[in-house]
């Protein structure tokens, strides 16, 4: 890599080690098809990445965020926990209301169905129709 290019980047990214990480990440992005923001001039991807950082066509902060996201194995999703807390309340009033709210099913309570009710329900089910593929 050209020493002049590295020296041009030091005032943009103060830490040389961070500069190497960011330029390497950008070079990998370029080799995978990311669009160039400067002319290539027959330079290789690491030199082009350093020139992009030196010319400030790519901000080091954006590169740093992209590098962090590319290295993450688990992406944390921010979900509001304040809404989940009232649902988990174990008050007696909430426990009494929950079993009664069965939605559109009416009086049916699946957790209290007897074996005879289950067998009666299975007998009322229509058998599946036979298709041409199954007849072979």
From Swiss-Prot:
Molecular function GO terms recorded: DNA binding; DNA-directed RNA polymerase activity
Record's protein name: DNA-directed RNA polymerase subunit omega
Uppermost EC category: transferase
Source species: Methylobacterium nodulans (strain LMG 21967 / CNCM I-2342 / ORS 2060)
Alphabetical list of PANTHER family matching this protein: DNA-DIRECTED RNA POLYMERASE SUBUNIT OMEGA (PTHR34476:SF1)
Catalytic activity: RNA(n) + a ribonucleoside 5'-triphosphate = RNA(n+1) + diphosphate
EC number: 2.7.7.6
Family to which the UniProt record says this protein belongs: Belongs to the RNA polymerase subunit omega family.
């Amino acid at each position: 890599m050209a020493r002049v290019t590295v020296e041009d980047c030091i005032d943009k990214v103060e830490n040389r080690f961070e500069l190497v990480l960011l330029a390497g990440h950008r070079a990998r992005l370029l080799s995978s098809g990311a669009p160039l923001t400067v002319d290539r001039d027959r330079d290789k991807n690491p030199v082009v990445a350093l020139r992009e950082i030196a010319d400030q066509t790519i901000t080091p902060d954006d590169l740093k965020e992209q590098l962090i996201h590319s290295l993450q194995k688990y992406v944390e999703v921010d979900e509001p926990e304040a809404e989940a807390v009232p649902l988990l309340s174990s008050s007696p009033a909430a426990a009494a209301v929950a079993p009664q709210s069965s939605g559109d099913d009416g009086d049916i309570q699946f957790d209290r169905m007897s074996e005879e009710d289950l067998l009666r329900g299975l007998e009322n089910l229509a058998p599946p129709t036979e298709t041409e593929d199954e007849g072979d």
